[in-house]
Design a protein with these regions (language model features):
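RecA-like P-loop NTPase motor core of helicase/translocase proteins
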Residues: 1-241
């Protein structure tokens, strides 16, 4: 995944990484965010973008623990003012922040025509987004891309959205993961649940089917639609409400 992101960034391409939940996405995303900053001189800063405040703290602490013996600093942004300060700093940094703070900075705090506005707008950034569908909506990503026109985007997800399970969006907003992060219909790298179970990176599933005994599937289907069964279900619902 790290190498795939590096190669894509060298070509100025964005993309998404499909890694199953529990397979170590946080460590992978840290290394990927770090390597983009270290290996691609044209990138001014890398931004690890997340959604919720509790996840912000959790991820910040994880990143800082990874960076203890590393050669780069991880800067967190507790406040929007801190985010602006980090963005204005001339040093190349890896920043951990929430999309809410980024949105407030872009839409409310930066004033067009000011030195802050022009400098931050001109930065070449690489965004790495954890849980990319939850953290950044299609509209939010479009708004941020319009402001940061020199940006690359890499989304991590354990549950990509494909054509067959896409969500309806307003207008021409992206509906699938590929449309949102773009890589010609396929992830930059994938590590599926099947591979993770095989590698014993995550626990497997124990499937146990519960149902009526001694009844064929055809009989079960007929019994399911009888008035007696439907009344029984209705009684259970009413008694529990």
């Amino acid at each position: 995944a790290i190498e795939a992101m590096r190669e894509a960034s060298k070509k100025g391409k964005s993309g998404f990484i499909w890694h199953t939940t529990g397979s170590g996405k946080t460590m992978t995303s840290y290394k990927a965010t770090r390597n983009l900053l270290m290996d691609i001189p044209s990138i001014d800063k890398t931004v690890f973008l997340i959604d919720r405040k509790d996840l912000d703290t959790q991820t910040k602490l994880a990143f800082q623990s990874y960076a203890e013996n590393d050669t780069i600093d991880v800067d967190d942004t507790d406040y929007v003012d801190t985010l602006i300060k980090r963005m204005m700093d001339d040093s190349r940094q890896m920043i951990v922040t929430t999309r809410q703070k980024m949105q407030i900075m872009v839409s409310k705090r930066l004033k067009e025509g000011t030195r802050q506005y022009e400098k931050i707008k001109g930065l070449k950034l690489a965004f790495v987004v954890d849980e990319c569908h939850r953290a950044v909506t299609p509209q939010t990503k479009r708004d941020l891309e319009r402001f940061f026109s020199n940006s690359l985007w890499y989304g991590f997800t354990g549950t990509p959205i494909f054509e067959e399970n896409k969500y309806e969006q307003k207008g021409d907003l992206p509906q699938t993961t590929d449309q949102l992060y773009g890589n010609n219909g396929k992830p930059l790298h994938s590590y599926t649940i099947k591979e993770a179970i095989h590698d014993e990176a995550v626990l497997g599933f124990m499937v146990e089917n519960l149902g009526p005994k001694g009844i064929s599937p055809e009989q079960e289907e007929c019994l399911y639609h009888t008035d007696t069964h439907m009344r029984s279900v209705l009684n259970v619902i009413l008694n529990q409400s």
